[in-house]
Amino acid sequence: MKQPTLIRPRLRHRRSTPAAATKMCPKRHWLVNNRAAGSRGSGGAAARSRRSLDQIVEVLVALIVVNCLATAAAALITPPDSLESLGSLGIPSSSASSSEDDDDMSSGFYRIPHRLEGYPQLQQLQRGQNFKISPKPCSFGRVEGTCMFVWECIKSEGKHVGMCVDSFMFGSCCTHNYTDNIVLPQTAFSYTRPTKPLTLRPRPPAAPYKPMISGMTTIERPHGAGTLVIRPSGPHHQGTLARPHPPPYQSKPTTASDLHGSASHPSSSSSSSSSSNPNSIWHTSTQQQQQQQHQQNQQNHWQMTTEPSFITKPRPTGWTKPGIVNLPMPARPSKPSKPTKKPIVYDRTPPPPPSVPPSTSTSTTSTSLIWPAQTHPPQPHRPTRPQLSPGTSLAASSSSHWPSSTTSTTSSTTSTTTTTTTTRRTTTPTTTTRRTTTNKPTRPYQRPTTATSSSSTSTTSSKTPTTTRPISSSSSSSSGIVTSSQRPTQPTHRTPVLATSGIETNEISDSSIPDAGALGHVKTISAARSECGVPTLARPETRIVGGKSAAFGRWPWQVSVRRTSFFGFSSTHRCGGALINENWIATAGHCVDDLLISQIRIRVGEYDFSHVQEQLPYIERGVAKKVVHPKYSFLTYEYDLALVKLEQPLEFAPHVSPICLPETDSLLIGMNATVTGWGRLSEGGTLPSVLQEVSVPIVSNDNCKSMFMRAGRQEFIPDIFLCAGYETGGQDSCQGDSGGPLQAKSQDGRFFLAGIISWGIGCAEANLPGVCTRISKFTPWILEHVR
């Protein structure tokens, strides 16, 4: 034991290792290596070669194992079933289904504002498994087509006419060589379905023809000045009717049959008529024209559009729009209306009225036409449909009256008076010589809105005062001969209307409401210095139940609240709004609460987002100030109201005008209101480019709560909320409509802002009505800021 310990130190100090020798003597390093190689011999070389071979084999085995593991891991991460179900998302099917269910539950459980960007994007990504372009209509020039993929167009032997866009996908506007899709450019009316003249029909049809067009939307776009192109209607829209303008009246009838066949139905026009009553509102002038044949009036008839035909209606040169004269009157009608639905006419003949001494006579005349009549005995005649003042639901009655005499002989002059007044109850004197019967109207140009009352005559020669019933919300009409020697007196009794031709419409009139006093007369107030609530371009008639594209200029107070994008160079639609004066607009609080003033843009006079060349251009303004209601809650959407002030005041135009505000706090239960906006056509559906409108009834808050309860929801509906919708669903606002107006028509013919669209659960679902902010509760607050 001691010997090794004694020898090792000596060996360590006397002998140096090769490494030490190398450090000490670098020049003799090769000698040390030779000595080490000689000492180890051939056995060391064989060991080194074996170790190198083992290392090479280990590296190769490791590479093979890593490759196998990577392949197995890739197969586990992307199984085939997930590829089929999720496309390129790479999400397992089980997790995808569970997350989709969670998204469905979350989206249907909470209150969701009806603005864009209201839904999570993950749900849309997961539902976009198979990317498809919806077959919506597209047009290039006067060529109609369908949007689809290019390969679909080629496979269906179609013709590519242009490019179309559906969400983020670009497709081909493809047209096919079908008969319904051919539109000849040289014809003004192509492939329309004409109806027979009304003179050849025993009675008008019960309902207009409604073409069912799947996947189409009604788009009424201007196609140049003075021309209106009406496109095919959508799956929930009814057929669009285009009526020709009535020709003016002539001063003399051509034959006696014309006089007796229709009291105010002359052949052609060669006179100028205007309102002579100082209290009348509408002034209409016509140019003098040459007398034409009587049969030309019978050839103008109603025409219906079929897919995808166009109906082009040029405006006559002598036609002027009716002006508005601001006169202090108890009620006023609105603009003339454009018919969209044929009425259903039915006759009722109550018993004849009692005779009254001839000292009673009352009449208000607005238009009087006097011409000599020929010597023919009076015969049963057909009353014409008088041209109505727009907005009035009572039509003027027209009948022919001869002066009182003992025999049915000739008369020197015959006066026919067509009157439209704006009072709810007026007294109509009738000079009678023979009983006549009200038959079907013969002129298709003039259409009443709700009722046409015509006075029938008896064989007595005394004057009979009658009081017409207030059939609709605006006025009643009277006709007769006014004698200047007698002063009108008011009768103390009421007699039924002799013969009434009623027209069934889908509008809720005052007669269908249980008690007009229960609703209360809604008084309106204007926040602007000019007139409010009266559209000047479009002439609305009856409200259409079911969504459809609005006419250009029909809702001139509709605005688009937009958010700037691309560093302020462009803007995108976010919400709707309502113009209340030249400086301020009203919208929902959740539309602008999270935006800076520099991010908000207001566009007024807009109609079609996809077209710039419209009848009148839109106006876009920046925002100088925003005022969100101080009690606004983003959790419950209570007090969801905001005011936005424009940078520069607006100049009102025919397509830009303000809406009235409700002055009285009326519940408005049972009234029909109209929702307008550019929101989605269905929940999660496509966004339209043309302004849409839909009519919905206003329900009470208690009924609204019960509707939510029937749908399995318990919602708190305070009095600052206003519910509108059907129990069965089908018509409602949707994402993108938030902040837009819920407008209703008052008894004076003006539209007022009943509500601002706030929130809803889903879109157009049963027992889930849309909820708006009730503006009547905030009228003082609005006027405080805008005045």
From Swiss-Prot:
Which keywords annotate this record?
A: Disulfide bond, Glycoprotein, Hydrolase, Membrane, Protease, Serine protease, Signal-anchor, Transmembrane, Transmembrane helix, Zymogen
Q: Where is the Peptidase S1 domain?
A: 544-787
Low complexity: which segments have biased composition? 262-280, 287-303, 358-368, 393-438, 449-485
**Modification after translation:** May activate itself by proteolytic cleavage.
**Which residues are catalytic?**
H590, D640, S738
In this chain, the stretch annotated as Disordered covers 1-22, 225-516
Task: Give Gene Ontology CC terms.
Answer: plasma membrane
Q: Compositional bias (Polar residues) spans?
A: 502-512
Q: How does it sit in the membrane?
A: Single-pass type II membrane protein
Which pairs are disulfide-linked?
C532-C660, C575-C591, C704-C723, C734-C763
In the induction comment, the record states: By 20-hydroxyecdysone (20HE).
Task: Keyword check for Transmembrane, yes or no.
Answer: yes
Q: Which GO terms describe its molecular function?
A: serine-type endopeptidase activity
Q: What is this protein called?
A: Serine proteinase stubble
Native species: Drosophila melanogaster (Fruit fly)
Its gene name is Sb
